[in-house]
Every structure is written in C-alpha cells, then in structure tokens.
Amino acid sequence: MLDFMDYIQLAFAEATSWNRDNSYSSLTATAQSLLDFSTPERLRVHISSLATPHFATSYTLGTVGLIDGSVSYLYSTVPLDNTPSRSALIPLRKLARGYRQVQPPVAPVEDWGWNSLLDGLGSFQSTHAGDGNTHVSLSQKATLLHATLHLPPPTTLNALFLRRISPTMQLSLAVCSTRGPPLSKSAPQASLLGQLCHDTGKYSNEYLFSTDNSLFGWRGLWNFGPDPRHPRDPSSPPVSLLSAGAEAYYSPVSSLIGMSTGLRFSTLPAATETPSSTTTTTPISTFPYTLTLILTPLTGSLSTTYSLRASPNLAFSSRFGFNVYSWESEMVAGCELWRRRRKPQHQQDDPADHDGLEWARRKMRMHDPDYAPPTAPAPAPVAAESDEGNESVLKIRVDQSWNVRLLWEGRVKELLVSAGVGLGPSSFSPSSWSVPASGSAQAGGGGGHAKSYWHGVGVSVSYSS
C-alpha cells in the first residue's frame, strides 16, 4: 500500500496534468504492481494529515527488532482541494496499486501561466477579488517540497524538490543524507540525484545525474500512432498503444556502462467501453491486457510480462526471465482479487448487473444481428461508485521455487490495514530481474541458503485526516 506522502505526490501529478505512464520507468509498472509487491515488516503504524490544501504531515512508528520511525512534511504550491485525505474516504485503488490501465497520450496543457518567475501574489489576489477563474490561482510554476527524517540514529534525511518549469518539462532534485556514528567526525554521507523530464505526449525524454560515482543517465520513450498534439478524429479514439523505449547510464569515475531497451503493447480504455449509440458497430474487442518485453544486452537478460484484467475485480500477471550467459531462468505468476462492499438490501439492483460478468453478456449479444447496443450512461458516476465499493484486495505471488507471498489490504472502520506473509522452501531468487529478498529470508549459517519455510509476517496500520 502506498504511503500517504506518495499518495499526495500522485495527487500533485494529477493536479498538474503530468502523465506518469508516458515514461520508460513506467514500462513494466503493471506487472511490478502484481508480482513485485512487498509485505509489511512486523508492526508499523502511520498517522498522516492534509492539514491545509498546501501542507501535509506524516508520522511513522515501527518495530523491526528495534523501535524506529520517521517524520515527513510536504508542501505544494498547487492547492489539493479535491484530494480526499481521510483514510475512510480515500479510494482504495489509489493506495493499493494493482492492474494499471495505461491511458492514451495527451498533449501538454498550455493554458497555465508557466512564464511567471515567481509565485505571484497578484494571481491569488485576483482570485479573492471574485473573478471566479480557478486557473488564475494556478498562474505560477507548480512546486512541491517534501522531506522525511528517519529515526533513530543513524538518522537519514530524504528531501525532494519538484518543479514544473514549462508545460512539457519537469525538474526534480532528490537528496539523501545519512549521519555517521556518534563518535565519528567525518561529514555525513550525502548524494544528489537530479532529473529533468521532457514530455510532449508523442515522446518523452529523461536526463539524470547522480553525484554517487558521477553517474549520467538518459531514458526515452516513443509512442507509435498519431501525435496527440495534432488530433485528427476525436470521434474514434485509439484502442491500443505500442510504445518503445531505452535507457543508458555511464559513470566516468567507475567506468560503468548500463543500458536496456523495451517494448510495451497495451489496450486502452476505448477498447472495452460499451458502445455509446446504436450506430456504433465496434464490439467489445478483448480483455484489458498489457504485454512488455525488456532486453538488457550487456548482462544478457531477457524478460517478458503478460498482465490481464479478467474482470473489474480480478487480474492476473506472469513474468518469464532468461539469461543467455548463465542460462538461468525465472518464472513468476501472481493475481489480485478485489472484494466489493455489499450494498444494502433496499439499494440492490439486478444481481446480474453487479457480478462482474456483464462484459461476457455484452460480448455474446454482439453476435446477435437483432441486438441494438444500449446508450451508455455517464462514465464519471460509475467510476466513482466503483472506487467507493472496493473494500479489500488479496494479492498472491508465487515463483518457480514455490516461494509464496500473500498480501491483504483493506479498510477496517476508519483505518487502512495491510497484512502480509512470505512462505517458501528457500530464499527468493537472487537473479537480477527479481526483487531482493528481505533480511529475514536470508537467516541461517553456513555457505548456502537457509531452508526456512517462514520468511516473515507483518501488519501495517494507517490513519489519515
């Protein structure tokens, strides 16, 4: 489950119309959400609050052998008035990341005052004067400041500076500083990561620099198909999207070189929408699904993923990896199952409309020549009702060594709860394409892996206001 501060950062991206899907780093986001999820460690409590539309705080207390915790603060120049902050009102699908429906590329928003050098006070005064234009208050460069202090010693400080410098460009600076031992007189270890993103909708480029080993990097993504900046026929939206990307890294200090390339094919929401009129003859084509292919030439690694959303409440994903140099392979499969809140008896409609199989009935009716597609209702209320009806989700992940992870995430009264467990005959695969195993999975002496069937169990409880 996402932390509250990560949720606020996603709300900031939505408020500033930044498409996080149009990035090479998000190429395998769907498969990672279903296969590479992590389970809580022991007991952890989160208390958060969006005190004002511009300011948020979060406090964390955990027990992982020792008592530890963190304090986080966040400030945004963009007001987040429409962002639900109470844990009882936040849509669960916003926090429990599952199957990620890729959205079609969109053109950058051009109607903001991006050329202002300062967060102009006059813009806010004109709004209070009563002109009623909500975009006037946003006539500034959207900026986000975030800092987290991890305790106890050795304390670690993580800070983030995020700024939209133009409709197509975004700058982020991330700092990580760790204080040394109490008796050490050396300066704290610190590193800076700078990232400049350029997104035009048709393609995106990311330029990175890290002070750790003076690492330079580049990531790029290209979307095949029409350019969203020059729309042609808005009445026929695209039903699929093919994207190709690559990344490269180089460190002149350590003489390290890294690179990878990948493809992603995904269906878009228009592929499974209900026809809106009787003149529409396009049937429901398929389930929503996403295919990816990642190739790392220097290490000889090849990874493919296939994710499928079989129904609104059920999704599957699988991944196969192979290394041509070592002949090692990896196979991982996972799924998620959502449980919806049961409606009161007086609000229940036809049960056939809410069993998650309406897509199959529509698909069968499409083959009837006498069938006329009904007029589709407004999509916004349906989406809101779907978010409010989600009560919990169960995720399962298993690999070729029969290592199993179980994760349950749901709402209990006013609290958001995550509970997970890891089981298996051995530690998780140490291959380059899998998630590193936790420390509890590596327990045991000798030169080999410990044959432990219990990798750990944990519970995380969150409350926000």
UniProtKB/Swiss-Prot annotation:
Any GO BP: mitochondrial genome maintenance
GO CC annotations, alphabetized: ERMES complex; SAM complex
Keyword hit for Nuclease: no
Annotated TM spans: none
Keyword Repressor set for record: no
InterPro entries: Mdm10
Membrane topology: Multi-pass membrane protein
Keyword terms, alphabetized: Membrane, Mitochondrion, Mitochondrion outer membrane, Transmembrane, Transmembrane beta strand
Cell compartment(s), UniProt: Mitochondrion outer membrane
First-listed, main subcellular location of the protein, grouped into a coarse class: mitochondrion
UniProt domain comment: Lacks alpha-helical transmembrane segments, suggesting that it resides in the membrane via beta-sheet conformations similar to those predicted for other outer membrane proteins and porin.
Reported function: Component of the ERMES/MDM complex, which serves as a molecular tether to connect the endoplasmic reticulum and mitochondria. Components of this complex are involved in the control of mitochondrial shape and protein biogenesis and may function in phospholipid exchange. mdm10 is involved in the late assembly steps of the general translocase of the mitochondrial outer membrane (TOM complex). Functions in the tom40-specific route of the assembly of outer membrane beta-barrel proteins, including the association of tom40 with the receptor tom22 and small TOM proteins.
Protein family: Belongs to the MDM10 family.
Complex and partners: Component of the ER-mitochondria encounter structure (ERMES) or MDM complex, composed of mmm1, mdm10, mdm12 and mdm34. Associates with the mitochondrial outer membrane sorting assembly machinery SAM(core) complex.
The protein, known as: Mitochondrial distribution and morphology protein 10
Species of origin: Aspergillus clavatus (strain ATCC 1007 / CBS 513.65 / DSM 816 / NCTC 3887 / NRRL 1 / QM 1276 / 107)
